[in-house]
């Protein structure tokens, strides 16, 4: 509880975090968590070039926003959901790490399940775990579950028609 109160009082506002001001100076942070705006530009470019689909990044960011917002409403000691999204490696993980072709599910429904689970695990690890950044752990855990997601959310085979009832 003390850790959350201490760090919450030191967080800059969400607009400053969006453009990379993470403290008294610009760019105080590790690579990838400095400027969320630049990461969002990278997301827009990859979506425009159809390198990735929107399913994984949007589901991760939306899930983290909703659950951290509910926690903030229940107890204002928890950080503002915009500050949670724009600080740390959440954007980097959601945009560039979780969308890896090899380790992410094949179907759009599977991608949404994968993203929601990553977002939920991220919030849980960040708030109740011993690590302030749970994004990488959440991605690794869900990478292990990707074959299971692919098993239960199978893509239609080429030429397959829906079953008649």
Protein language model features and the residues they cover:
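Loop-to-transmembrane alpha-helix initiation sites
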Residues: 81-90, 111-113, 129-142
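Structural signature of hydrophobic alpha-helical transmembrane segments
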Residues: 25-36, 78-90
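Membrane-helix interface "capping/anchor" motifs
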Residues: 46-58, 101-112
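Individual transmembrane alpha-helix segments
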Residues: 9-38, 42
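Conserved mixed alpha/beta catalytic, RNA-binding, or beta-rich assembly cores of soluble enzyme
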Residues: 47-76
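Hydrophobic alpha-helical segments embedded in the membrane of multi-pass proteins
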Residues: 36-40, 58-66, 84-98, 112-120
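Cytosolic-side transmembrane-helix boundaries in multi-pass membrane proteins
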Residues: 125-165
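Short, small-residue-biased leader/transition segments that mark boundaries at the very start
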Residues: 1-6
């Amino acid at each position: 509880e003390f850790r959350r109160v201490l760090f919450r009082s030191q967080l800059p506002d969400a607009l400053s975090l969006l453009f990379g001001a993470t403290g008294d100076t610009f760019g105080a942070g590790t690579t990838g968590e400095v400027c969320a705006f630049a990461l969002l530009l990278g997301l827009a470019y990859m979506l425009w070039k159809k390198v990735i689909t929107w399913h994984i990044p949007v589901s991760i960011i939306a899930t983290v926003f909703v659950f951290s917002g509910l926690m903030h409403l229940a107890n204002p000691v928890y950080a503002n959901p915009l500050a949670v999204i724009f600080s740390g490696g959440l954007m980097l993980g959601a945009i560039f790490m979780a969308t890896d072709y090899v380790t992410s599910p094949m179907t759009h429904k599977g991608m949404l399940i994968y993203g929601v689970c990553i977002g939920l695990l991220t919030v849980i690890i960040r708030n109740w775990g011993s690590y302030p950044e749970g994004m990488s752990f959440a991605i690794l855990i869900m990478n292990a579950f990707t074959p299971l997601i692919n098993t239960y959310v199978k893509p239609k085979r080429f030429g397959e028609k829906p079953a008649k009832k």
